[in-house]
Structures are given as structure tokens and as C-alpha cells.
Regions:
Chain A
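A structural signal for multi-pass alpha-helical bundles of membrane permease subunits
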Residues: 2-276
Length: 276, 432, 304
């Protein structure tokens, strides 16, 4: 970029500072309010808390089933991502390395799913899950998350596998390995960066999904964190400090995940956008 | 050959993952059925504000029935109806379900999900007939224990009234005079907003407006199709509510129900048009019966009889498909009895039990509210019965018309016409 | 010599190859088709039915659609949601897309701190839309909020924009990320050549950066479009499924939820009608994608 004058840079940093403030302030407010007792929220709405009031968090953990909700979200995210990776990798391997009549169409078929909003089939998905006996169980949300994540997985992994030099597979084939063994022993280890990217990119929307848990899950034992957030917000609306503690707790895992794994995340998005 | 073993391995892993997911799902379902002797009954209602209090009340049941615990999981008021129905339809509903009166609760029975309680409720014949009707079919099947009624009126902060030397108004003109004085003094006259769709209809219109449209007799005429919402008496009610617009706080268009409660409870406004159920909320916020007073909806002219909206609020139903039917029946019998009634009214002042037993009210505000019914003509919320059975329901239409009127989107006449015309699209007695 | 990619070899080998291919493809294909694609088609089928309960059973043909488009109390909601969604989309595009583009330019500058800004800009996107909605709702409270006594969420003119601002605040980081990646991908020789020729920042942007980023602009626009026209969470958290005030914040997502899953008292229409709403959404989104394709791909087929 052009070399700026001192003034230009000052203006730039001012702009950036303003932008950072716009991002940070609501988050700051969320955390700070969660550390106040309800009365102080009204007398001192925007300033830092007078004391570090941890009761809101303590109450949330002891009075509500927060541990269960958190565990459910973890199971849903974990199992879904494993399945997305596994299923996508298997399909991507065939689509990348094999050319047969219809393979291009099949690939397009998968990738089209990137812009098909699964929400539009919700009524029938609910019907399906009830029919299979999966509603009000984590399995229903898992299956939905997997279906949503497969297009991106196939999209990313197919290209990635294509880039793996054919010589490696050919050499293995000469040695007597079958396709499946090639996949398991040679391709998969090389795929790890792409797998990590797919995993991290999918984690955020799966963790934060509200719509499908709202429609598919009913009993308390099955709720995930976003659903519990909405429930607790409704139950304790009159206690603002508590409500913000709930919001903060809901946000910590994903923010942490992002800060720790942003490298993989960016890698995943890079792959996706470069091809788009 | 070697290759096949590996292919199988990969495939097996994939299958196992799917199986693991299904197992996780099914086990979450299975968790609910407990094989042990101790039973947990799931109870649901729309009263999310009452978790602590309800737990204390239900603990009394567990004292006499040690192997039965009640797990109270309320759902936010606005989501409750859909949640309840969805739960019943998909067999994931609670065991004990609070039911709204008339059509909304009736759909649960019509769907075949509720247990017939006609022979289960002890002394059903001693319950007030108007209450029983709200949870029974015309053929005499009662599907909900008539549990709780609520009333509507105006709360006020005693200290603010004393400051201006104000007395509780009994007529509308006195009421407006009080509002004027407070406004001139710079006080927030009402902690009232126009954002939430239901508050203006359920409390302000049905509560304060009833004195203008003529209470129960007008409501009956309306349901029969003999009266219209565009008739002068109903329009007078709309107009009266509209006249309160200038006393609403700055920003009232964006003030939601919870903020309203907070505002009044923390002493930032002089009056609050609300329901008897709010007593507990205000107490929790620091405004107990020593600090706040209450008066009944002011009558239109001096000498009028009070038309008092004593609404049939909640009945208690039993899920036919409950996995702990016997324990649930025990609980139903208990909630229809005196011990529950007394404990409930102690913990949740402002809810008036229909139970035919002698109970004493400990809260002075609740006592005032209850006494007002003695000398009044009682009615229920305007378009609750029959007129909200289908879409667009009377309730949701009022929820658009009244807030719209309060932000001057509609005139009182237009608001009335809006509800009337939309109802006429499906309500047979209105089509002519 | 072992088989190669299935083109030669004995029939048994070919069969084995196909079995292998099927085994690898089917799991993903099945889950994708059965859980994502088929339900959408099935919902379209269900829209031709009516009746209470979870699964409508009376076949009524196009009666639901007739009802939706001829009866005022239904059509008002559908057209209202459509109009709101368009306004919503335009505001979000302006902030998230246009402003995001310029911010992406800013965070890719070769100055100290730019990488940090870039990393932080994505933070709001990691939150749940629900959390953002609740947060903004509290901030806009007329009594205790940040922005004074004005009823932002109560005034029909400002409520929907408030939702759009909240969503943009949250997702601008995603646009910045994608644009930044694109900017990173511009070969530095191009930029240097332009600099040598004396181009300033604005000319550089217009003639080099923007054309290079056009595919990404297209992708971001498409993502925003599909996301906005199915957006539900922000309405739920900021103005409830009743889309207060008076349905002026109603988007297709909230209309669909309310129509399909609420009781009549709260504005529900029954499952058959709800399915009709989701089918209408399918058409609207498809139409939008078709328009997008024409704008971003069709007219560019001749260019690089």
C-alpha cells in the first residue's frame, strides 16, 4: 500500500481504535454486567463492577442444569464434527481420485448444499425424527448438523485430496494396497490440516445453532447451551446480572475456540473462498 | 485378500460413528424413563418468575409422598402454548401441565392428550361453576383442575401518592386528575409500555376498559354476535385507554413487560396497571405491601358498579401418556385440595384459588384485590373465550390494535374496527 | 499389474471398484439427501395439506396458497415479511459488505497492529446470534440502555434497522476475513506496478483490488442473501417471535416459525400453512440465487 504521512497513520489508528471500541464495548458490557448483583445493574449500568460478584455464575451452575446443557453441546459438536469429517473424507476421496460418469455431477450435487438452507425443510425433518424416535434426543440435532456440514467438508477435502500427488497412491497400489488401505494409511495423514480446518470452521455454527435445538429438543435433559440461554433468559428476566452471566457463559467456549485455533479457522476459510 | 479387510475397517468406523450418534440420541431419550422406585414428575407452566416459590410449595407434597419429587420446569409465557402442544404431540410433554382457560387449553383435550379428571378431582361439584366451565367440555368432561384466578387493577407507590396528597381514585375522572397532578409534578405517572403485544390487552383493556364496555353482559353479547367491538360502549373503552397515552413514560413505545415491572418495582414510577400476579415480583424488587398500594379499576361514572376482570387463569391438567400415571394422579388430587391452596396462596400472593376450602390470605394487597370481587360484577378477559379459537385470534388482533392505538397508528375507532373486521373473517356470529 | 482407476480389468475388479466407491460415497450421500434435501421437497408436498396437529392429513391442493395470497390477515404477513427482508438485506449489505470491504483494506495494511485488528474483528462472529440479540436488546432499552430514552425497538421506523445493525455488527468480521484473504491473494507485483505508476490508494482499490475481489464480493453477497432470508435468531432474541412492534421486524424466518410452530392465539397458522410459508421461502431464495447468478456469473462469463 502507499506509504502514508504521519497524519494519515494517525487517522488510521484513530479509525481502528474506534472500530475496536465498537466491537469490544458490547462484549465488555456483557461481562461487566454479569459480575454485578441485580440492584447494581440499575444504579451503575455502564461502569465496571464495584466488587467481583461471582454469585451469578455460582447460582447458574448450582441452580440450573448448566453442566448438562454444556455436556450436551459438547457431545453434539464433537460427534457431529467427527461424522462430518469421516463422511466427507470418504466421499471426497472417491470424487477426487475417481472419474466416472456422473462424478462431476455428484460433486456439484454435494457442493450445491452450501447454499441450500436446511431450515426450509424443518417441518419434514421434525416429522422424520419423530418417526425414527430420535426427537428430543441429541441424535436428531447431530444428524442435522452433519447434513449441514457435509457440503463444506466435501468441497474442501475434494480439492485437497486432488492436490495429493498421484505417485504416492500409485506406489502404494504397486505394492499391493487396495483403495481403502491407501485411503486410511496414506491419504488421511496428509489430510490432517484440511480436516482441522473443516472441524474448526464447523464448530462455531454447530455450537451456536439455536433453530434446530429449538424445534427438535424439548425436555430439559436434552437442551444445548443456546437453548438453555434462551430458557434462562426467559426464566430470570428480572435478574439482569444473572442473565448476562448466562450470555457470557454461552460465549466463552466459542471465543476461546476461536482464539486458540484461529490459524486453522483462517486456513479453512481461505480454502473455501479461494475456490469460490 | 488384504484390501477387503481394510475397506471393512474404514466402513466399520463410519458405521460405528453413526451408531454412536444414534446411541447418544436414544440414550438421551431413555434417560427420562427411570426404573427406580423414586419417581420424578415433570411439571410445567408459564410462570417462570415463580421457580423458587413453586419448589417450596411442591416440597410439601414430597413431604407426604417421599418417593415422588416434582421437577418444575416453566417455559417463558410467550412460548408456553406452542411448547406445551409440541411436547404433547411428540410424547415429550411434562406429566402435569398448567392449562390456560377455554379454547387454548381445550385444544390439548381435543387432541386427545389429556386425562379425564372428572372423577379424579375431589369435590369437583363444590368448585365455582364458572371456573369449572373454563376447563370442561359442554358434555361435562373436566380435563383441568380449576386452579387459579387473577384480577386486574392499578398498583401505586404510597410514598409518591403521599408526596402529592393523593387518594385512591374510584371514578375515571378522579383517576385522570391523579394522573394530571403526577405529570405536572414531573413524576413518571405509569410504568407502562406499548412494546409487548399482550400487556395492553390483557390487563389495561380487559381490566380498566371493562368498566366502559359493560363487563360480562357486554362480553356475552359480543360472543353471541349481538354486539360488535365497533359499538359505542366498546369504542368508549378504547378511547378511555387511549386517553392515558400522554401519561406514559418517555420511550414507552420500546418498553417491554419486564422493564415495566423493574421500573415500578424499583420505585421509578408512581403507578402500574397490572395483574394480581405481580405482587410477588414487586416484593422481590423491594416494593412490598408496606410500600405499595392497590385500587380497583376506576368506574366510568360515580355510582357505577365495578366490572371486575377476575380472569380464569390456570387449570392443571394431566398428560394421558405420563409414564408415572399413578403418582401424577396423586399430585392432581393434592393440588385440588386445601393444603396446596393455602401454601400456594401464601407463597404466590395474588393468585386466587378456586379450591372449595377455607383459606386465609396473608398478604394485604391480595386481600384487597379479593375483596373487590365481592361487590362487583365479575368477568373475564374480553376476547379470550371462543373469539381466540382460530387464526387470526382475538387475542393476537388486540395485541396489534391496542399498541398500535397507543402509538397513534390507529384511532380508537380504527383499532376497534381492525379487530372486529379480522374476526369476522372466521367467527361465524360476526358474519352477517 | 493391478487395476488402475477402474477403466480396465476384469469384471470382478470393476464390480469391486464400484462397491468400494459406493461404500465411500453412500454414507455422506445418504445423510445429505435424507436429512437436508428430501425434507425440503417433502415440506413442499406437505404444503398441499391441511389439518391440525403435527402432520396435516387432509389434501387441499393449492388451497393454502390461495388463502395466503387472498386473505388479508395472511397476505399482510407474507408481504410484510418479504418487504422487511429486503430492507433488512439492503441495510446489512451496506454495512457488512460495503463497509466490510473498506475495513478489510484497512486491516491488510502493512502497518503494526493490523494483524491484531484483523484477528479481533472476527470475534463477534463467533458469538451466538441469540447472545448478540439479547445483548443489543438490553443496550437499546429505553430506561436502562445505552442510547437514551428513545424507543429504538418500539418505533416502527427504527426497529428493523436496529436488528440489521446488530446482525451487521456481528458478521462484518466474516466479510472482513474473506475480503482480507482475497486481498492477500493479489500478487504483489500488480500492486507494486501500480505504485510505480503513481497510483494512489483510491485508484489502486478501484482498478486492481476491486476487480480481483469480485468473486469474493459475489460469494459474500450470496452468503448474506441466503443467511438474511432465513434469519430467525435475531428476531427471536430482540423482538420475540411476535416481531414487535406490530410485526414490523418480521422476517421470513420468524414468520415461518410463528406460522408453523405457534398456537393460533400467538399467531400460528397450522402446519400445512407453515409448510406453505417455507415453500414460498424456497422460491424466494431460489429466485435470489438466480438473480445473483445472472449478476455475478452470467455477465462475467466472457471475462477472466
Amino acid at each position: 500500500m502507499s506509504t502514508g504521512l504521519k497524519l494519515k497513520d494517525k487517522f488510521y489508528y484513530l479509525l481502528m481504535a474506534f472500530y475496536m471500541a465498537v466491537i469490544a464495548y458490547p462484549l465488555y458490557l456483557m461481562v461487566v454486567t454479569s459480575l454485578k448483583p441485580n440492584a447494581e445493574v440499575f444504579t451503575n449500568p455502564f461502569g465496571p463492577p464495584k466488587t467481583l460478584y461471582l454469585d451469578n455464575y455460582a447460582n447458574m451452575i448450582s441452580r440450573s442444569n448448566y453442566g448438562t446443557y454444556f455436556g450436551n453441546s459438547l457431545v453434539v459438536a464433537g460427534v457431529s464434527i467427527m461424522m462430518i469429517v469421516a463422511l466427507s473424507a470418504l466421499a471426497a476421496y472417491v470424487l477426487a481420485k475417481h472419474r466416472f460418469r456422473g462424478s462431476a455431477a455428484l460433486y456439484a450435487f454435494f457442493v450445491a448444499g452450501l447454499i441450500i438452507p436446511i431450515k426450509l425443510g424443518t417441518i419434514s425433518i421434525l416429522k422424520l425424527m419423530i418417526g425414527w424416535g430420535l426427537h428430543d434426543g441429541l441424535g436428531s440435532v447431530i444428524l442435522v448438523s452433519v447434513a449441514t456440514g457435509i457440503p463444506f467438508g466435501v468441497f474442501i477435502l475434494t480439492d485437497f485430496i486432488r492436490m495429493i500427488p498421484e505417485e504416492l497412491s500409485s506406489a502404494a497400489r504397486i505394492d499391493g494396497c487396495g483403495e481403502a488401505a491407501i485411503f486410511a494409511r496414506i491419504i488421511t495423514p496428509l489430510l490432517l490440516p484440511a480436516i482441522a480446518a473443516v472441524a474448526v470452521v464447523n464448530f462455531i455454527p454447530i455450537w451456536n445453532d439455536f433453530w434446530f435445538p429449538l424445534v427438535l429438543l424439548k425436555s430439559d435433559a436434552a437442551k444445548t447451551v443456546p437453548l438453555a440461554t434462551a430458557l434462562l433468559f426467559g426464566q430470570y428476566q428480572t435478574n439482569y446480572g444473572y442473565v448476562f452471566a448466562v450470555l457470557t457463559m454461552a460465549s466463552v467456549p466459542v471465543v476461546l475456540m476461536y482464539l486458540l485455533f484461529s490459524k486453522w479457522f483462517i486456513k479453512g476459510m481461505t480454502e473455501g473462498s479461494v475456490k469460490g | 485378500m488384504k484390501t477387503f479387510k481394510h475397506a471393512k475397517a474404514v466402513r466399520t468406523i463410519a458405521v460405528l460413528l453413526v451408531a454412536a450418534a444414534l446411541a447418544a440420541g436414544l440414550s438421551a431419550c431413555a434417560k427420562k424413563t427411570e426404573a427406580s422406585k423414586s419417581v420424578t414428575l415433570n411439571l410445567t407452566s408459564w410462570r417462570t418468575e415463580d421457580i423458587e416459590r413453586m419448589n417450596r410449595v411442591n416440597a410439601l407434597f414430597t413431604k407426604t409422598h417421599p418417593n415422588i419429587t416434582i421437577n418444575f420446569q416453566p417455559v417463558n409465557d410467550t412460548e408456553y402454548d406452542a411448547n406445551m402442544r409440541a411436547g404433547l404431540e411428540t410424547d415429550t410433554g411434562a406429566d402435569i401441565i398448567w392449562l390456560r382457560s377455554y379454547d387454548t387449553g381445550r385444544t390439548a383435550y381435543d387432541g386427545g392428550w389429556l386425562y379425564d379428571l372428572t372423577k379424579v378431582i375431589p369435590d369437583l361439584d363444590k368448585f365455582p361453576p364458572s371456573a369449572v366451565k373454563a376447563w370442561s367440555t359442554a358434555e361435562g368432561v373436566t380435563y383441568g383442575v380449576p386452579s387459579v384466578g387473577v384480577t386486574h387493577g392499578v398498583y401505586y407507590q404510597k410514598s409518591i401518592f403521599e408526596k402529592y396528597g393523593l387518594k385512591e381514585p374510584s371514578t375515571w375522572d378522579e383517576f385522570i386528575a391523579v394522573c394530571e397532578t403526577l405529570k405536572k409534578g414531573g413524576e413518571n405517572v405509569f410504568a407502562q409500555g406499548a412494546l409487548d403485544d399482550w400487556t395492553l390487552y390483557e390487563v389495561v383493556f380487559s381490566g380498566l376498559g371493562a368498566n366502559f364496555y359493560g363487563g360480562e353482559s357486554a362480553r356475552q353479547a359480543l360472543m353471541a354476535g349481538k354486539a360488535k367491538l365497533t359499538d359505542p360502549n366498546f369504542v368508549a373503552a378504547f378511547k378511555a385507554i387511549d386517553s392515558l397515552q400522554k401519561y406514559l413514560p418517555k420511550g414507552y413505545e420500546g418498553l417491554d413487560y419486564v422493564s415495566m415491572q423493574q421500573m415500578f418495582g424499583s420505585g421509578q414510577a408512581a403507578m402500574f396497571m397490572g395483574g394480581s400476579w405481580e405482587i410477588g415480583v414487586f416484593e422481590d424488587l423491594g416494593s412490598d405491601s408496606a410500600k405499595i398500594g392497590w385500587f380497583a379499576p376506576p368506574v366510568a361514572k360515580a355510582g357505577d358498579k365495578l366490572q371486575y376482570c377476575f380472569h380464569v387463569d390456570a387449570g392443571i391438567g394431566l398428560n394421558k401418556k405420563s409414564k408415572n400415571l399413578d403418582a401424577a394422579i396423586e399430585y392432581i388430587k393434592w393440588v385440588a385440595g386445601a393444603e396446596y391452596a393455602q401454601a400456594f396462596m401464601n407463597e404466590l400472593p395474588g393468585f386466587f384459588m378456586y379450591t372449595p376450602a377455607k383459606v386465609t390470605l396473608t398478604n394485604s394487597l391480595a386481600q384487597e384485590m379479593f375483596d373487590a370481587a365481592g361487590t362487583a360484577d365479575n368477568t373475564v378477559r374480553t376476547v379470550w373465550e371462543k373469539l381466540s379459537a382460530q387464526s387470526p385470534s382475538g387475542n393476537s388482533l388486540m395485541g396489534v390494535a391496542l399498541p398500535g392505538m397507543m402509538v397513534d397508528k390507529y384511532t380508537p375507532e380504527q383499532a376497534a374496527a381492525y379487530v372486529q373486521d379480522q374476526l369476522a373473517s372466521w367467527y361465524a356470529p360476526f358474519k352477517n | 499389474m493391478k487395476r488402475n482407476d477402474g477403466k480396465t480389468g476384469r469384471r470382478f475388479d470393476r464390480l469391486r471398484t464400484w462397491v468400494f466407491r459406493a461404500a465411500f460415497l453412500l454414507p455422506a450421500l445418504l445423510v445429505y439427501a435424507v436429512v437436508l434435501l428430501i425434507p425440503i421437497l417433502d415440506s413442499m408436498r406437505l404444503s398441499l395439506y391441511s389439518g391440525g396437529g403435527l402432520v396435516p392429513t387432509d389434501f387441499v391442493g393449492l388451497a393454502n396458497y390461495v388463502k395466503i395470497f387472498t386473505e388479508e390477515s395472511f397476505s399482510a404477513h407474507v408481504w410484510g415479511a418479504f418487504r422487511n427482508n429486503i430492507v433488512f438485506f439492503l441495510i446489512v449489505t451496506l454495512i457488512q459488505n460495503a463497509l466490510g470491504f473498506f475495513l478489510a483494506l484497512a486491516v491488510t495494511r502493512a502497518v503494526r497492529g493490523a494483524a491484531f485488528f484483523r484477528k479481533i474483528s472476527f470475534l463477534p462472529t463467533t458469538l451466538s446470534v441469540l447472545v448478540v440479540g439479547f445483548l443489543f436488546r438490553q443496550m437499546l432499552n429505553p430506561i436502562w440502555g445505552l442510547l437514551g430514552n428513545y424507543p429504538w425497538l418500539g418505533n416502527e421506523a427504527t426497529a428493523l434497522p436496529a436488528l440489521a445493525v446488530a446482525v451487521s455488527w456481528q458478521f462484518i468480521g466474516e466479510s472482513i476475513l474473506l475480503y482480507a484473504i482475497g486481498i492477500d491473494g493479489i500478487p504483489s507485483e500488480h500492486l507494486e506496478a501500480a505504485r510505480i505508476d503513481g497510483a494512489d490508494w483510491m485508484q489502486e482499490t478501484r482498478h486492481i483490488v476491486l476487480p480481483a475481489l469480485m468473486p469474493i464480493v459475489g460469494m459474500v453477497t450470496l452468503l448474506i442473501f441466503v443467511g438474511d432470508f432465513t434469519q430467525f435468531d435475531i428476531v427471536y432474541s430482540m423482538t420475540t417471535t411476535m416481531a414487535n412492534p406490530r410485526y414490523t421486524t418480521d422476517l421470513f424466518g420468524s414468520l415461518f416459525y410463528r406460522a408453523a410452530f405457534s398456537t393460533p392465539v400467538r399467531g400460528g397458522w397450522g402446519m400445512g400453512m407453515g409448510a406453505a410459508v417455507s415453500t414460498i421461502m424456497v422460491f424466494v431464495v431460489s429466485l435470489g440465487v438466480a438473480v445473483w447468478y445472472y449478476l455475478f456469473k452470467g455477465s462475467r462469463r466472457g471475462e477472466v
